[in-house]
């Protein structure tokens, strides 16, 4: 990682003052002492999900009180596991599924998962990534009907989304309840755009040629490596402008699009500048005024941006963050969930980290819990032939994080150690209205649509009947 992205590291040094990263002169915890957590973060359960060196990629929690299910993406194990966490101190695996003939497959496997609801039925989409020359190189996602949980006999595969034009599968995805009533599935692909699928068409048995309804171009490709694709994105409703907006991390920078008509996206503005190579994750605040971004290389902090001038149409590009945050300047934070003013971070070797943006100019750490307990810089890299292990990578440990809005339960997936469940003192759930914000987050209201959106003129689909 260091050698490949040395030039990007130099670029970050040039903007260190602007992002106000943790002072490298500050005392940091020795790597062999990263155990346990802060007094306000309580570990409820830990499940070692697999026997091998690599356990999980992402994690997803259902949000309805009557459905206490957590989905763990099995990464290079090529499987998905579903846990009943009705008693969060004693998770119970109720279902697992592995790709057929796993021994014939090569790749990073089961990466990202999203649950969604259409009509009265619940579904789960598991994304996959397999190498060319092996089975299912064109497979993007497997869709399960999970309405009948916790009975495993009632879980059924109902569709598979394939994209043979660009083999390699879907690295990241986002399920979104659009303001027009449709449930859409945004997916990364090895091309210069994100794909947009109509999930009702996918699960209802419609002709597969009708599933794909739109593409969101990537205006910020990673030119140094010839990479045109998005890495990740967030989609949310802007209650002030009555627009559905797409926030894309395009590896060479970030972009915001109006996807109110997903068949014809309109670019609004970009974030580009020094130190933004490998632009990885882009998450706005509920009102779209601020955003948290991640760039995927060692020593870089999460950056905080004021998006106001871009959202108001005063500029086409923003190039200077207003602050930054890091758990440990020697490492790298990964994915994050915003529940304003809190940001919940899956911080690779630094486990679960929680900071707040009560003052966006001065982010403050609120709690942590170390989950990796791993050897520093022996993270993910290489190929299947060397067990995917590197001696220069910090990409190991906490991979994904999710927050259950109705009660504040925190789920975290760790690449090395498996599934973890937590609670934080004083955080008993989240509703944007309680903090003076729209009730907008990555959590979707599949029954009513986005907070603040007019009722759609047409009824949404009913799913598979």
Model-identified regions with their sequence ranges:
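Bacterial N-terminal signal peptides that target proteins for export
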Residues: 1-8
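N-terminal signal peptide c-region/cleavage motif recognized by signal peptidases
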Residues: 15-16
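Feature marking well-ordered beta-strand scaffolds used for ligand recognition
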Residues: 21-465
